[in-house]
Structures are given as structure tokens and as C-alpha cells.
Amino acid sequence: MAKQSMKAREVKRVKLADKFFAKRAELKAIISDVNASDEDRWNAVLKLQTLPRDSSPSRQRNPCRQTGRPHGYVGKFGLSRIKLREAAMRGEVPGLKKASW
């Protein structure tokens, strides 16, 4: 299982992303607006850089439900590749079978 601190850190990232979602969207809209002045766009970039890093949704990871493994995550099943293979070999995943050709 994943450490409790890793789970807490992920929860913190989700909360920060929700909290700053509107602010980030507003600043990104100014940055991508071609009609905005260069000074306004530059100020928006600087303000975006002052926001917490963990408020960016791209910092979030999808951990495996069984083990908490953050890499090799298969989103359709919510499991890491290792646990998905084990479950498939036991026949616990409906409609999933080992490939053979």
C-alpha cells in the first residue's frame, strides 16, 4: 500500500486544484488572448507563476486502488498494470482475456 503521507499529498493537490481552478483559467485566458496587450499578458504570466505548483491539475497522479502504485496506471480499471494482469489471470475482470495470435 502507498504511504499515508503520499495519499495525503494527493488529497492536498486535488483540493488546491479545485481552489485555484477559476483563477488559473482566468489567467490562462488572458495569456492566450491575442487582443490583450503585451503588458497584460506578461502580468498574467507572472501572476500564474505565483500560484502554488500543486494547484495545477497536471501535478495530480492516479494511484492504483489496491497498491497505491502511481506508475503503470490503467484508468479504465483503476489498477496498475501488475494488479490488472494478476486479476485478469484469475479471471476477475469480465471480458478481459490474454492475447494470443
Swiss-Prot record:
One Pfam family named in its UniProt record: Ribosomal_S14
GO (cellular component) term, any one: cytoplasm
GO terms for MF: rRNA binding; structural constituent of ribosome
Stored InterPro entries: Ribosomal_uS14, Ribosomal_uS14_bac/plastid, Ribosomal_uS14_CS
Polar residues: bias regions: 52-65
Spans annotated as Disordered: 51-72
Keyword Ribosomal protein: yes
PROSITE patterns in alphabetical order: RIBOSOMAL_S14
Keywords: Ribonucleoprotein, Ribosomal protein, RNA-binding, rRNA-binding
Domain of life: Bacteria
Alphabetical GO biological process terms: translation
Family stated for the protein in its record: Belongs to the universal ribosomal protein uS14 family.
Job description of the protein: Binds 16S rRNA, required for the assembly of 30S particles and may also be responsible for determining the conformation of the 16S rRNA at the A site.
Subunit and partners: Part of the 30S ribosomal subunit. Contacts proteins S3 and S10.
Name the UniProt record assigns to this protein: Small ribosomal subunit protein uS14
Originating organism: Buchnera aphidicola subsp. Acyrthosiphon kondoi
